[in-house]
């Protein structure tokens, strides 16, 4: 993810440019609260949490795997930012992430959805993802 502190000047300029065109800005970051605070200083509307480490560590200890994401999402929320998440999310790990961080606005799911569709079919796969994304509704 972006280092929002090291690249603050560039990201601030890009946020201003996109906002001037009416485009919402989300900055992709690693799960570090200071990166969320940095994204807020840059003028972003949202962050997107890079969830590869969560997905990798989820089978080992889901509470430990989600902890840095919860802290970072809280920092984002405290800063007035929306929260997105994405990378390696799937039918196994998505629901727990959304139950733990219920204020996640959007998730990005790509490869896993297509892989699941090979086994379950596309309609069933989309249905299963919708069930998991509506856990807090």
Residue map of PLM features:
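C-terminal helical cap(s) of enzyme catalytic domains, especially alpha/beta-barrels
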Residues: 61-62, 116-137
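Short acidic/polar alpha-helix capping motifs at helix-coil junctions
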Residues: 1-4, 40, 57-61, 134-136
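Aromatic/hydrophobic pocket-lining residues that form the small-molecule binding cavity
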Residues: 7, 11, 32, 65, ...
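Histidine/lysine/aspartate-rich catalytic loop segments that bind and position anionic ligands
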Residues: 23-76
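Glycine-rich phosphate-binding active-site loops on the catalytic face of alpha/beta enzymes
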Residues: 46-58, 103-122
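Active-site beta-loop-alpha junctions enriched in small/polar residues
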Residues: 30-32, 50-54, 81-82, 86-92, ...
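Catalytic cores of alpha/beta
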Residues: 32-42, 85, 89-104
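Alpha-helix-loop-beta-strand connector modules within alpha/beta enzyme cores
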Residues: 4-26, 62-85, 101, 129-133
